[in-house]
Design a protein with these regions (language model features):
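Flexible, glycine/charged-enriched surface loops at secondary-structure junctions
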Residues: 21, 37-44, 117, 154-163, ...
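Glycine-rich phosphate/diphosphate-binding loop of Rossmann-like nucleotide-binding domains
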Residues: 191-194, 199-310
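Phosphate-interaction motifs
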Residues: 59-120, 124, 128
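Glycine/serine-rich phosphate-binding loop and adjoining beta1-alpha1 elements at the start
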Residues: 94, 113-227
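Structured beta-strand/loop patches that form or line metal/cofactor-binding pockets in enzymes
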Residues: 40-71
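Adenosine-phosphate binding glycine-rich loop
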Residues: 1-23, 218, 317, 332-444
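Rossmann-like adenosine-cofactor binding region
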Residues: 262-362, 367
């Protein structure tokens, strides 16, 4: 395989999809050496088959707002690869959603799900609809209209969506209710459900908790204790909230959180009481993070991200490409020695190069934030056997999965000088499992 040639061909065939191109380039550049040890892969054009989704559904979503006006949005579902299990990946509702972003997310999801060792393929879906500023009734009407098309393409053994940005328990509940009505069956077709109707304990916390469990494994490789360390967290949604919660439990000091308008810097640290306020502000009132600064009298910086502040550890938990090369240099200059990604692809290629050249601990999202989909997989298992596990059981399984992912990254990513290239390790480990499954199943 010539990675540059494969990427050039994909850009020609699928122009105007920069996030998708970026994700493919990052993976190909790290697996090329291992791939070329297997000439049998090229004989069946494996890499092209793996880069291009199995299928893409694109549809119009028509719904009525509270004023009686008819609105239209675009809906999508990218079913990328099901070589190792049913398609599995979240649904994102955000004004920035387009096909290129969802193809990147589905591509990444394929390798992330492979890393968990659970039987899940990769997919992703969503819409350019944004729940922000919408009433509860409007969100329900949209979710029902969205599921009116999506339901025919998903199923517990076919494709199992979950939440993502803009899609929390409320939205999953609305979509599940509509699916149940259309399909005339109660089944585990969505994960992230409420506990009352098939959801799993620890699922809301899983991505944030899992990221910290992975971070702890990384820190062990350098004999570093997380207690007392100053942490920068971006975002204030589900992932960021539970990242902060686990950090507080472990004795770390979190000084930032953010949203799309700006970030807060609290030098005293965000404690349990302050985090409870943020959770209520964001989850119940759909408020803005600046209200935290007004309540607690700390610094608020509008229109910026929190990467200029001094800290030991950075945990980007908001969105893709939120850390660029210049941000990465500032983080290192300000003392950051570990970056663990809670969001999907939050660091640009230039930022990743800066981190790796500085030899700091850097964990890509496909490894570090795999906790969310791992517990989604555990929710699927509980649904299939019609049982619920305790919080302790699920949490222990999550810790074990994140430890195993870390071990796989170390196995495939340790370089001659001893530095662990977690990007390479995650990509090669995830790729090899999918590649072997595809080879065994023939040309399909």
């Amino acid at each position: 395989m010539n990675a540059a040639k494969v990427l050039e061909d994909l850009k020609r065939r699928f122009p105007n999809e920069p996030e998708y191109h970026q994700a493919v380039e990052e993976v190909l550049s790290t697996i090329e050496e291992e791939y070329n040890k297997h000439p049998e892969f090229d004989k069946v054009n494996l890499i092209e088959r793996l880069c291009i989704p199995d299928r893409v559904y694109q549809f119009r979503v028509t719904w009525m707002d509270d004023k009686g006006n008819i609105q239209t949005n675009m809906g999508y579902r990218v079913q990328h690869n099901n070589a190792i299990g049913p398609y599995k990946g979240g649904i994102r509702f955000h004004s920035s959603v387009n096909l290129g972003i969802l193809k990147f997310l589905a591509f990444e999801q394929t390798f992330k799900n492979s890393l968990t060792t659970l039987p899940m393929g990769g997919g992703k879906g969503g819409s350019d609809f944004s729940p922000r500023g919408k009433s509860n009734a409007e969100v329900m009407h949209f979710c029902q209209a969205f599921m009116l098309e999506l339901w025919r393409h998903i199923g517990p053994e076919t494709d199992v969506p979950a939440g993502d940005i803009g899609v929390g328990g409320r939205e999953v509940g609305f979509m599940f209710g509509m699916y149940k009505k259309l399909a005339h069956e109660f089944t585990g077709v969505l994960t992230g459900k409420g506990r009352e109707f098939g959801g799993s304990l620890i699922r809301p916390e899983a991505t944030g908790y899992g990221n910290i469990y992975f971070l702890l494994e990384m820190l062990k490789t350098r004999n570093i204790d997380i207690a007392g360390k100053t942490c920068l967290v971006s975002g204030s949604g589900n992932v960021a909230q539970y990242t902060v919660e686990k950090l507080i439990q472990l004795g770390a000091k979190v000084v930032t959180m953010s949203d799309s308008d700006g970030y807060i810097y609290d030098p005293d640290g965000i404690d349990r009481e302050k985090l409870d306020y943020i959770m209520e502000l964001k989850n119940l009132y759909r408020g803005r993070i600046r209200e935290y600064a007004e309540k607690y009298g700390c610094k608020y910086v509008a229109g910026a991200r929190p990467w200029n502040e001094k800290a030991d550890i950075a945990l980007p938990s908001a969105t893709q490409n939120e850390i660029n090369g210049d941000d990465a240099k500032v983080l290192i200059a300000n003392g950051v020695f570990a970056v663990s990604e809670g969001a999907n692809m939050p660091s640009t290629p230039e930022a990743i190069r800066v981190f790796q050249e500085a030899k700091i601990l850097y964990a890509p999202g496909k490894a570090a934030n795999a906790g969310g989909v791992s517990v989604s997989g555990l929710e699927m298992t509980q649904n299939s056997i019609k049982l619920s596990w305790s919080q302790e059981e699920v949490d222990e399984k999550l810790k074990s999965i994140m430890k195993n992912i870390h071990e796989a990254c170390v196995q495939y990513g340790t370089e001659p000088d001893g530095y662990i290239n977690y990007v390479k390790g995650a990509n090669v480990a995830g790729f090899m499992k999918v590649a072997k499954a595809m080879m065994a199943q023939g040309i399909v």
